[in-house]
Swiss-Prot record:
Protein name per its UniProtKB record: Kallikrein-8
Gene Ontology cellular-component terms listed: cytoplasm; extracellular space; secretory granule; serine protease inhibitor complex
Enzyme Commission number, as recorded: 3.4.21.118
Native source organism of the sequence: Rattus norvegicus (Rat)
Subunit structure: Interacts with SPINK9.
GO biological process: keratinocyte proliferation; memory; neuron projection morphogenesis; protein maturation; proteolysis; regulation of synapse organization; response to wounding; synapse organization
């Protein structure tokens, strides 16, 4: 566990890309919580929001007092991280905003091809340490991979309707279940790697535009980072796709350890 999948891109994946087989199936850029509800305020104390000025870019997950985990495609030239937030319209008591000091994409992430979602994971080092407490605290990283059928929580400020977009002011949550790798591959033929995990529900609960980089939490442990899925979102037969944390634990810990 913890070893990332190989960086090499298989020839058949490249053929899919060249043929445009991904058209209409991805939503990673910016990538709600469909069929969810408002989270209990500060029940997800590891949830963060990435902002470029006043614009929400992505979600993120606090994994250390100076470290946030998110999707690699969320990287921007200059942006900040908000912690302890619930309502984006008003300042919450525990809310903190810290500038990003450094963005470290996984070395195998292909930033030149927006259709390639492999290794879509990134560590953000904050300029200053976060003030930790009950409403702002890091989450534990998965050492073991999630089990099929396991119930998990997804959260974010992304759109709550699709294809029309309607962004909420408050953090939304929904319950999903882990899909088998075979079921995931049947939903997205030729597009799923061992570094990805699918999760969804029969009622269409799903992440969507604006949720990229946010957490998939199972039994209080971080098992996934929101990356991509179907467009429109919320199709029961087309689950959300997440970067599988258990495959990257070693890289995460090694990268954080080098700079702490």
């Amino acid at each position: 566990m913890g070893r990332p999948p190989p960086c090499a891109i298989q020839t058949w994946i490249l053929l899919f890309l060249l043929m445009g087989a991904w058209a209409g199936l991805t939503r990673a850029q910016g990538s709600k919580i469909l069929e969810g509800q408002e989270c209990k305020p500060h029940s997800q104390p590891w949830q963060t929001a990435l902002f470029q000025g006043e614009r929400l870019v992505c979600g993120g997950v606090l994994v250390g007092d100076r470290w946030v985990l998110t999707a690699a495609h969320c990287k921007k030239d200059k942006y900040s991280v908000r912690l302890g937030d619930h309502s984006l319209q008003k300042r919450d008591e525990p809310e903190q905003e810290i500038q990003v000091a450094r963005s470290i994409q996984h070395p195998c992430f292909n930033s030149s091809n927006p259709e390639d979602h492999s290794h879509d994971i990134m560590l953000i080092r904050l300029q200053n340490s976060a003030n930790l407490g009950d409403k702002v605290k890091p989450i534990e990283l998965a050492n073991l991979c999630p089990k099929v059928g396991q119930k998990c929580i997804i959260s974010g400020w992304g759109t709550v309707t699709s294809p029309q977009e309607n962004f909420p002011n408050t953090l939304n949550c929904a319950e999903v279940k882990i899909y088998s790798q075979n079921k995931c591959e049947r939903a997205y033929p030729g597009k799923i790697t061992e570094g990805m995990v699918c999760a969804g529900s029969s009622n269409g609960a799903d992440t969507c535009q604006g949720d990229s980089g946010g957490p998939l939490v199972c039994n209080g442990v971080l098992q996934g980072i929101t990356t991509w899925g179907s467009d429109p979102c919320g199709k029961p037969e087309k689950p959300g796709v997440y970067t599988k944390i258990c495959r990257y634990t070693n890289w995460i810990k090694k990268t954080m350890g080098k700079r702490d």
